[in-house]
Amino acid sequence: MQRTNKRYPIGSHLVVYHFGYSHHGIYAGRGRVIHYSGFAHLFKKKPIEITTLSQFSHGKKIHVRHYEHARYKGRIVVRRMRSRMHENHYHLILNNCEHLCSWAI
């Protein structure tokens, strides 16, 4: 099982690779990740939520997606993610966890 006690900069775009798909979230600080939980619950439609790093990663290695020209950074990214909390418009193709993170950054 992969340890998730590594520190990430606030506002980092985190990615976990699973068989056949990847899951994306934004690091919000204090070991928490904001993400669209659609894939996290086996394709069930769920809202944007805050979970721990270990809940987000399910024991998999966490990768950081780097942006050369990010429009927003740090706490502003987290604020943008929080502005969409409890949204429940997940769509595998049109509005997924990766789209949400890219929008926030």
Predicted segments with their positions:
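Cysteine-nucleophile amide-bond enzymes
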Residues: 1-105
